[in-house]
Amino acid sequence: MALLQIAEPGQTAAPHQLRLAVGIDLGTTNSLVASVRSRQVQVLLDDKESALIPSVVHYTETSKMVGVTAFEQASYDPQNTIISAKRLIGRSLMDVQTRYPNLPYQFQASENGLPLIHTRQGYKSPIEVSADILSHLNHLAEQRLAGELSGVVITVPAYFDDAQRQSTKDAARLVGLNVLRLLNEPTAAAIAYGLDSGQEGVIAVYDLGGGTFDISILRLSKGVFEVLATGGDTALGGDDFDHLLADWIATQAAVQPKNATEQRQLLTLATQTKIALSQADETPLHFANWTGNITQAQFNQLIQPLVKRSLVACRRALKDASVDIEEVCQVVMVGGSTRVPFVREAVGEFFAKKPLTSIDPDKVVALGAAIQADILVGNKPDNEMLLLDVVPLSLGIETMGGLVEKIIPRNTTIPVARAQEFTTAKDGQTAMSVHVLQGERELVDDCRSLARFTLRGIPPMVAGAATIRVTYQVDADGLLSVTAMEKSTKVQASIQIKPSYGLTDEEVTQMIKSSMSNAKADMEARQLAEQRVEADRAIEMVMAALQKDGKAVLSVAEFNAIEVEMQKLIELKAGTDRIAIQQSIKDLDLATQAFAAKRMNLSIQKALAGKAVDEII
């Protein structure tokens, strides 16, 4: 006997149109813009084939420059060349002057106490400066992508407060950008490495840039990143490595720079040397009239105190997060200064695991933001194409006997909605448990449990009288909504699930293969379970009838004969012979036919008792 009545399915299928979206790493020193193109995420390059755009704006009376050309003006016109506006955004003037007393700008407070920077174009707020950088990045993106952007994801430090985040949004909106989301920089880096769809656990993001160091401790649970703690050092970065190396070179050469030009030349040499030592064990040096060399070991010794400072901040962040080092499952490296081999080695030793370094640390945040932007704008991410375009595994529901009734079959295109109707199994039943399952097997024990919920408030009726409509709906993002509704009262309950969460492509494939290799055995098990359900139903009905009317209409011999057949079915039901159970159900049905007729007659007699003939006619 069928437990479900399949209603006419309703199905929708709105095709996706690719929209242009980018991820922006709005950095303190440099900014980057990235996008997903032809299913590949990549950083967009400027006219000089550079990915890094200096976060610098230079103002003249009638124009402004952004990026490299603006940075080139810093030495000649520092008061009109705004560098590191990110440090100022969302802060009060008093806070800015306390934190950064040596900035070369002329400040004035706005009406609400925020800093305004005097330039040749008048006073500029950090929001306006950031807006000019974002406008430049937007123009670059629209040139490279040959179209108008539908939205952007902008990254911010995890420690940014509400004012700093809102100011960043305001800067974007000032130039007409549709901000899909502000994304924490460490989260973006983790997304770039695909950690959002992998294992759950604690992730450390070690971000050593040019001027600052940030450490973030994240917990990934059910695809959601939670920031447990942040820390760092705003006066520690790759620039400090350069200054130490420059001082060492000047000491070795016994030459001190005489002016700003020579100082810049020395720092440039130090930077080039640092980069060279990331590739080689030793490199030659030439400064003024001096020639020498430096080994990687010597360089490591120079920067060791600075690296130790960063690890102290890491230990403090772990303590703040109440996390032991052993709990950290992945370490992500961000920032150009993490290219230094000694930094990678020290971080690896500290966390007792090899850090993730396969993605360019300068680009990793922008790449993660681009992946998120592509998802939020409505496009399909590479690693979820199968899971989002079609239902990868059938979605079903548990029925009596531990069976699975498939409601949305595997490979159904999404979005989709389908419904089936249940009925109650027992007299007076007022609640129904809904068990949502995923998989291709026939039995509940062999499928993946997604969720359970209970529909309450079903009006008490005889078994089979109530109708409960269960609707499964999968939207374009792969989110499954299940709703159960009793049709007469409209009382309902529902739940939302992400069926694709926690399953890799390999696991999906294995589940499909398992269903194929076990198809015959599964079908036999299903048929056996179905016969057991039918047997339970028959036994329950006969027992209730015997208890109510058996002694009134049956002789002892007739009563005993039915009990014998019923006991036989109970014993066979415990076995595995499906055919024998099926035959025993028929035997019990045959043995109770006369009893059913006598019960019918008894009911008629009771209905007619005390009534005159003319009342019946």
From Swiss-Prot:
Pfam families named in the record: HSP70
Keyword vocabulary terms for this entry: ATP-binding, Chaperone, Nucleotide-binding
Gene Ontology biological process: iron-sulfur cluster assembly
CDD domains xref list: ASKHA_NBD_HSP70_HscA
SUPFAM superfamilies reported for this sequence: Actin-like ATPase domain (SSF53067), Heat shock protein 70kD (HSP70), C-terminal subdomain (SSF100934), Heat shock protein 70kD (HSP70), peptide-binding domain (SSF100920)
UniProt-listed PROSITE patterns: HSP70_1, HSP70_2, HSP70_3
Molecular function in Gene Ontology: ATP binding; ATP hydrolysis activity; ATP-dependent protein folding chaperone; unfolded protein binding
Lipid metabolism as UniProt keyword: no
Function description: Chaperone involved in the maturation of iron-sulfur cluster-containing proteins. Has a low intrinsic ATPase activity which is markedly stimulated by HscB.
Family: Belongs to the heat shock protein 70 family.
Protein name in UniProt: Chaperone protein HscA homolog
Organism: Haemophilus ducreyi (strain 35000HP / ATCC 700724)
Lineage, broadest ranks: Bacteria, Pseudomonadati, Pseudomonadota, Gammaproteobacteria, Pasteurellales
Name of the gene: hscA
